A protein has these predicted regions:
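Short glycine-rich phosphate-binding loop at a beta-alpha junction
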Residues: 104-120
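Gly/Thr-rich phosphate-binding beta-strand-loop-beta motif of the actin/hexokinase/Hsp70
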Residues: 19-44
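Metal-dependent DNA phosphodiester-chemistry modules and their immediately adjacent helices/loops
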Residues: 122-216
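ATPase catalytic-site recognition across NTP-hydrolyzing enzymes
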Residues: 1-26
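Nucleic-acid-processing active sites and adjacent nucleic-acid-binding tracks
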Residues: 42-108
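Acidic, low-complexity intrinsically disordered tails
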Residues: 215, 219-226
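Flexible loop/turn segments at secondary-structure boundaries
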Residues: 1, 32-37, 47-49, 59-63, ...
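An acidic- and aromatic-residue-enriched active-site/binding cleft used to recognize and process polar
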Residues: 29-33, 44, 111-116, 128, ...
Length: 226
């Protein structure tokens, strides 16, 4: 996807206090609800992006013994929650989003069609439905459109995703595949021990980046620039 140095550059502290009241879009990704689920919020101020994220891991995932990344460290950092249930309920995600809605303006939630099928009712309960046009059902063609932008954002160090290294791990586990027409898609390097859910949640959110309203704080009030 990008060079290691670019991922290290993205692993910086985010001042979440400065983002309060700001516009953002959400991305959600998972392969199986008895494995990993990730949700995140993408902000854009000028050219700089910020990605606030959280991971839920099923304690009964069959892949845990294969994973070398120190998940317990991410839990201590507050970036990850172990779920002591056989499945990760969609409500874990929507409760997290509902809490973030008290702090930020979430314009849209992006996830792919198959994942939305499971999340649909829980998202509806917090006000997000395709009918309201605040849910984006991401297709491969949408990802192809933003892949070049994602590459640019990494190469120019235009994204910060906090001090936890888990996003670095997710992204390093993904690879960019280019077809004969030059279209880019993302694939897993190894599906069981090297998870990509966090990166793909960010990719989903990036497909809705144009929904983020640019705002500035003036005398403790927010004004929309465009």
């Amino acid at each position: 996807v990008t060079d290691w140095d670019n991922l290290v550059a993205a692993t910086q502290t985010i001042n979440e206090e400065e983002l309060k009241g700001m516009s953002c879009v959400a991305g959600i990704d998972y392969a199986k609800t008895n494995d990993f689920v990730v949700a995140g919020l993408l902000f854009k101020i000028g050219e700089q992006r910020y990605w606030i994220h959280h991971t839920w891991v099923c304690k009964y995932s069959r892949d845990l013994s294969r994973i070398k990344y120190p998940l317990a460290d991410a839990e201590k950092e507050g970036a990850l929650t172990f779920v002591d249930e056989v499945e990760i309920s969609p409500e874990y995600v929507t409760e997290w989003l509902a809490e973030k809605m008290k702090l930020y303006i979430i314009e849209s939630v992006a996830t792919d069609y198959f994942r939305h099928t499971l999340l649909r009712d829980a998202l509806k309960n917090i006000g997000f439905t395709p009918e309201k046009k605040n849910v984006k059902l991401v297709r491969p063609s949408d990802i192809m459109k933003v892949a070049v932008v994602i590459g640019y954002v990494f190469s120019k160090h235009l994204i910060k995703w906090g001090e936890s290294t888990i996003m670095r791990w997710y992204t390093w586990n993904a690879k960019a595949e280019i077809d004969s027409k030059g279209n880019i898609t993302y694939e897993k390097i190894e599906p069981r021990s090297r998870k990509t859910d966090g990166f793909m949640a960010y990719v989903a959110a990036a497909t809705e980046e144009d929904k983020i309203k640019q705002r500035t704080k003036v005398k403790r009030r927010l004004q929309t620039i465009c």
